[in-house]
Amino acid sequence: MLTRFAPSPTGYLHVGNIRTALICWMYTRNQNGKFLLRFDDTDLERSDIKYVDNIIEDLKWIGINWNSSFKQSERFERYNEVFLQLMKEGHIYACYETREELDTKRKLQLKQGFPPVYDKGALLLTEQEKIRYEQEGRKPHFRFKLDRNKTVKWNDEVKGEINIATIHISDPVVKREDGIYTYMLPSVIDDIDFNVTHVVRGEDHVTNTAVQIQMIQALKAKIPIFAHLPLLHFDDSKISKRKGGLDIKSIREDEIESMALTSYLAKLGTSDPIEAYIDMQSLIDSFDIKKFSSASLQFSLSEMYKLNSKVLQQMPFEMVQDRLSQIGSEFWYFIRSNIEKFSEVAKWWKICKFGIEPVVLNKEFIKIALSTLPQGDCNENTLSEWVKNIRQTIDIKAKDLFMQLRLALTGTETGPELAKLLIFIGRESIIARLEESQRIIQKV
């Protein structure tokens, strides 16, 4: 088994792109196959090396590796060779219509109630007419001649049996007036030359597949197995509020763990429940392309954020040790169940070890809290003893008491379990924070 992921280096990878790459890669690894990374950069003007680098970085971040890679821009000689072969055999023909002329044809067809399918008019041109057009300065574009008397059929791994009547499809342009190859032909040539056995991509390529199957047949090559995944639909109202939308670069900047995104995308649209995974191999082992539904899918940001928190909760210290600097395992195992993003670890470490901005609270409460703090090092019983001592001294609701203590010691109204926080803050620092609050109150 050999599959490929073929991004165009004309922009950042999007969630939809990375989902296709991930499913293709897991399918391959589950079957002990090989995975090929191909950069579709035939349009040299729009392609940029910075996007090549970024795509590689994003794929590595999510955990995808590959057995080999190449750029289509390295294979123009091969594409020219096959192009000339197909032209010689009558499968490709030159067209001289301008964009304006083609647009006029389309509008007329629609007005007459016909589908806007190219009429193959260029096939009727005489050699003299072609020469005249070229003398006028017209540069030809080239189309692949579809056999419109055939219905292309294949058994799709996700969508089941598909039948496409090519009579409803325009002969595709394979080479533009400026000499640049479009997506269609180079992709087919590469799949044949590199022995690609399975093609996994979005369902927006279904019509392309029908066209490419006829190209493969024209080249007398073996047709690969196809799997067309349903496209993701997004909640635009939520995504519009995100800087960068849903490209992988912005998701990484938003501190989504790679395994959170992987856990979500690998199971979205399958019969399996969406759960938090912390190792890729478990996802690979449970992968089955037949579990994917052909129904449309909704991508939920809130679901991904929930998974992010669950992934962090499951991560052992060894997985995060190199990201924690001087923070030890004890603090990690305490804090991981109370965070949504990894950066919150440093935030709470700072609160525990480096103090806070003093919070102005009730003067009497601070005085009593100081005088009733249990002696000795803080332990898991310190908070309950302290609360008992305070309530024996003043009449205060438990909810208000906890809120006052949390504000005085952490500067926040919410956070991790206070009883355990006291252990990391330490008795000395607790006293210092309460005394600082006292000094602030006296100045007010």
Swiss-Prot record:
Top EC category: ligase
The enzyme's E.C. designation: 6.1.1.17
Record-linked Pfam families: Anticodon_2, tRNA-synt_1c
Residue positions of motif 'KMSKS' region: 238-242
Catalyzed reaction equations: tRNA(Glu) + L-glutamate + ATP = L-glutamyl-tRNA(Glu) + AMP + diphosphate
A Gene Ontology cellular-component term: cytoplasm
GO biological process, one term: glutamyl-tRNA aminoacylation
Binding site for ATP: 241
UniProtKB keywords: Aminoacyl-tRNA synthetase, ATP-binding, Cytoplasm, Ligase, Nucleotide-binding, Protein biosynthesis
Motif ('HIGH' region): 7-17
A GO molecular-function descriptor: tRNA binding
KW Lipid biosynthesis (keyword) present: no
Cell compartments where the protein resides: Cytoplasm
Keyword Protein biosynthesis: yes
PROSITE patterns tied to this protein: AA_TRNA_LIGASE_I
Purpose: Catalyzes the attachment of glutamate to tRNA(Glu) in a two-step reaction: glutamate is first activated by ATP to form Glu-AMP and then transferred to the acceptor end of tRNA(Glu).
SUBUNIT field: Monomer.
Family: Belongs to the class-I aminoacyl-tRNA synthetase family. Glutamate--tRNA ligase type 1 subfamily.
Official protein name in the record: Glutamate--tRNA ligase 1
